[in-house]
From Swiss-Prot:
Assembly mode: Part of the 30S ribosomal subunit. Contacts proteins S3 and S10.
One cellular-component annotation, GO: cytoplasm
Region (Disordered): 1-23
Annotated protein name in UniProt: Small ribosomal subunit protein uS14
Keywords linked to the UniProt accession: Ribonucleoprotein, Ribosomal protein, RNA-binding, rRNA-binding
Record field: compositional bias (Basic residues): 11-23
GO BP term, pick one: translation
Molecular function per GO: rRNA binding; structural constituent of ribosome
Keyword Ribonucleoprotein among record annotations: yes
Job of this protein: Binds 16S rRNA, required for the assembly of 30S particles and may also be responsible for determining the conformation of the 16S rRNA at the A site.
NCBIfam families in UniProt: PRK08881.1
Amino acid sequence: MAKKSAIEKNNRRKKMTKNAAPKRARLKAIIADKSKPMEERFAATLKLAEMPRNSSATRIRNRCDLTGRPRSVYRLNKLSRIAIRDLGSRGLVPGLVKSSW
């Protein structure tokens, strides 16, 4: 089980990213638009740099919904390999059977 503080920190980052996404997209569009004057694009770059780092989507870590484990998390169901194995061995994942040959 991951530390509760790490899980909460990641949840705060998710919330902050969601709130700041429109503003970030607007600023990035201004920066990428070559028809705008250089001063305006530079000002947009400075505004983007002033935004909190945690509002960037790259700071979000994929974590297991059950355990909070940060590594080996499948995006499809947001569970770690260990959680999938545990649920599968208890028969809680439909269609998942233990392999034998």
